[in-house]
Amino acid sequence: MYASEHAAELVVARSLNPVLPSLKTVRRVGPDYRKGRDITGEELCATFGLCGVEYGEWLPDKERQESLNSCFDAFCDLADVLKVERTAIGFHGLLAVAFGSRGVSNALAHFEPLRFVFNLTRMKGAGSVAHEWFHAFDYFMGARKEGIKLDRRDPDLYMKTKDVVAITEQLFNDDPFADLVSGLKGHYLFGEEAKQWLIEKREGIFSRYLLAADDFVRALSEGCCCPVTADQRQRATALVDHLSSWVHDSDLYKRDTDELTRLFSDAMGWSVYRFSVSNACSRLLCIAREYLKAIESEKKNDQKVCVGRSKYYIESMLIDLGRCKPYWSKTLELAARAFGAYVERRLEADGRLSQFLVHSHKNECYSDANPYPEGDELDYIENLFDSLFSSVSI
């Protein structure tokens, strides 16, 4: 829907790489959990269940202390947003944090799933904590889904993490993570809007069916190699009329599509007929099946329906156009950025600010790209994250 309505804008290929804005000062508004005192690395690990803290060789002592204090505040804020125990933030002794070390290329922050550590680069890593933490959560839950127990004390941890696939990259159904992935990539309508869209879709398909039915009857009259008996013509016409009447059948969605095939087979009493007849018959059958599917969807999904790709997903694919392989539109990156936007919105709703944890996760902060969900899509994604974290334990 979004793509069709904004086709003219989306034609232009863009080679973009939106970068999180650097902050001169990192601000925070919220409870003073430290009571103004400095935090040690040992205290950070004990409070949040981290296995360790690593510092870059060239990180000055003052900056090291600022990083510890800011990270402590950020993790407290994150635990508040997620409503989890603080030790769950470090996955009970699994996660390590590095400040100004283990950097990768030009990344502001980077999570290493093989070692279960994320690095915040010197000066520029502020605002990436929520994003990188979700990557860790993604792999942690992926391991759990696959039955792989990750334990920092396990000498085979490195080999085990090599086999882990992020849970947002796995294929499964009827799961809060599956709902999240669908919500990230799909554009949904709800309530009366959903009902009306489904009705209009069904009516449009039925209009196409009537046209296909006319083509089928015409092909019977004009395209047969062998004479068509009056009985065959009568049965074929009756079949078309019968299918057309299904629009008034309240139990239509229960009909099996195999019944359609059988009805057509019974009607086709002759063995040799031109391609035009076969083609018209196949088209009619295909549209009839599509109509059945629309009816079934209308019965099952009258409160929610996916009508196409989300604006968030489309914009992410546009950013990837100039890249040799997808990055922004990868599922795990869509999820991590959306999580950052979710955390930022949750903090704002409570009158709080935590820029070391997350900042600038709004499209208005970027002049030529839209890397984050917004509006109604963010509203829906926010509810999905709420459902997710209320249904899983860390």
Model-found features: residue ranges?
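Divalent metal-coordination and catalytic microenvironments
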Residues: 78
